[in-house]
Amino acid sequence: MSVSTKAELMPAMEQAWLALNRELNLLSEAQMVQQKDATGWSVKDHLAHLTAWARSVLFFLQGRDRHAGLGVPEMVYLSEDEDQINAAIYAQHIDQPLADVLQQFRATYAQLLALVEPLTDDDLHKPYSHYLPNEPGDGDGPPAINVIYGNTVHHFQEHMRWIASLVVTE
């Protein structure tokens, strides 16, 4: 599913955020840090990952390089190899304390929400290239609303399923 208007985007973002936080509130610190999935990721690692991608959207909307928002080298980002990008994000946050990850997750989402709030439907339908005209890529890219939705609502829902299954199976 996707959205096509700000009137659809804002409640979808809120619902996905609240649902993910309800799931997180059920977990102990030990569950968030010690339990690992098949790839070795903990709940904390999933949250650091979500934070990095949400921050990349924040940077995108500000016209700043997304690789800087992700915290990965430009060449890694430009490779478009999501596994390599995600591995770089993981390595960057592996030793970060849970409290810091949670604080950054909440702060990044609040900053992103504050940046999206004043945007109009016209702003949200401007293509990727409007926000990052110098980033290489084919054509104009997707509309901003798709970038925002994909890296918040869709991404939160995707990782919430993984987090829930990780905790249930342990």
Task: Tell me what each language-model feature is.
Residues 135-152:
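Individual transmembrane alpha-helices with interfacial aromatic-anchor signatures
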Residues 10, 21, 44-47, 51, ...:
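Non-transmembrane alpha-helical segments in soluble domains
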Residues 149-170:
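A hydrophobic membrane-anchoring alpha-helix module
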Residues 18-44, 63-68, 115-138:
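Helix-loop segments that flank and shape redox-cofactor active sites
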Residues 40-42, 88-90, 143:
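Short, glycine/alanine-rich amphipathic alpha-helical segment
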Residues 3-29, 52-62, 150-157:
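Alpha-helical bundle segments that constitute or directly flank the non-heme di-iron/ferroxidase center
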Residues 1-8, 56-107, 170:
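Short, helix-capping/interhelical loops that line the mouth of catalytic, cofactor-
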